[in-house]
């Protein structure tokens, strides 16, 4: 994954807005110091980018943060995603299943914690509801089919794509969502839909534009 804040798959924090409307949310948001969140997030990015050594660190970091901020769905979603990734670090079948199931359970809980207050940013410039759903969608779509999460993952991705909140999200986050949608469309054998999302990335000059252009070029050859 790209290392800069503007090019990350999942964007990092901007200032909280609408403070008066978020009186019930600020307690959970402040429960995790931003510096600690960013440190854990950097480890998560490395893990997501293929650094297997960072998976354990990311899982431990976000699990620790979620234990302190038990009602923060964004932190819990990252904890769940990182825990699920730990399934790739062991050859033991029962450990693989344990990590995957524990991570999915955390993601399920994070989704249940979402309220209208999370339409605003929690730890990102992206609305918390979109971030949690996108993290969950990525994980659900990545786990093996026998875990029966693909349908829900596709549904969550669709909810993010169709949300009115997406228009106001950071361009980097939107680009990540469109790129994921394009990849899923390609997997589903729908090249026209994939091209539509890739074209959108390029037209909007999202940070993922170079990657989208490469995919478009590959599809045309």
Question: Can you annotate each of these PLM segments?
Answer:
Residues 13-24:
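Bacterial N-terminal signal peptides
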Residues 29-65, 78:
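N-terminal leader/linker segments that initiate helical-solenoid repeat arrays
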Residues 33-37, 55, 73, 77-80, ...:
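Start-of-helix signal in alpha-solenoid helical-repeat scaffolds, especially tetratricopeptide repeats
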Residues 44-49, 85-94, 118, 139-147, ...:
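Short coil/turn linking the two alpha-helices of tandem helical-hairpin repeats
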Residues 47-63, 96-116, 147-159:
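Helix-turn-helix repeat elements of alpha-solenoid scaffolds
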Residues 63-75, 108-129, 162-172:
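Flexible helix-coil transition and linker loops at the boundaries of alpha-helical arrays
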Residues 79, 86, 136, 140, ...:
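Structural register within alpha-helical repeat arrays
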Residues 171-221:
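Terminal, low-structured helical/coil segments at or just beyond the last alpha-helical repeat
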